Swiss-Prot record:
The gene is rpsR. InterPro entries: Ribosomal_bS18, Ribosomal_bS18_CS, Ribosomal_bS18_sf. Keywords: Ribonucleoprotein, Ribosomal protein, RNA-binding, rRNA-binding. It holds the Pfam family Ribosomal_S18. Binds as a heterodimer with protein bS6 to the central domain of the 16S rRNA, where it helps stabilize the platform of the 30S subunit. This is Small ribosomal subunit protein bS18. It comes from Zymomonas mobilis subsp. mobilis (strain ATCC 31821 / ZM4 / CP4). Part of the 30S ribosomal subunit. Forms a tight heterodimer with protein bS6. Belongs to the bacterial ribosomal protein bS18 family.
Amino acid sequence: MARPFFRRRKSCPFAAKDAPKIDYKDVRLLQGFVSERGKIVPSRITAVSAKKQRELARAIKRARHIGLLPFIVK
């Protein structure tokens, strides 16, 4: 009998060898990890590892500070 509430764990999208580098200038990549309201999406939803989530948050905040990403979306 299969486990009824068992979900397979997603792997980190930045763990592969050919995965994209997290860079604050890569706005297209960063927008995938920001909600419609401009908030950073938590790692339990995006399945990003803790280390890469910190790098991602730092890159998003840096991009916001220099004006590449908005702080809030109306």
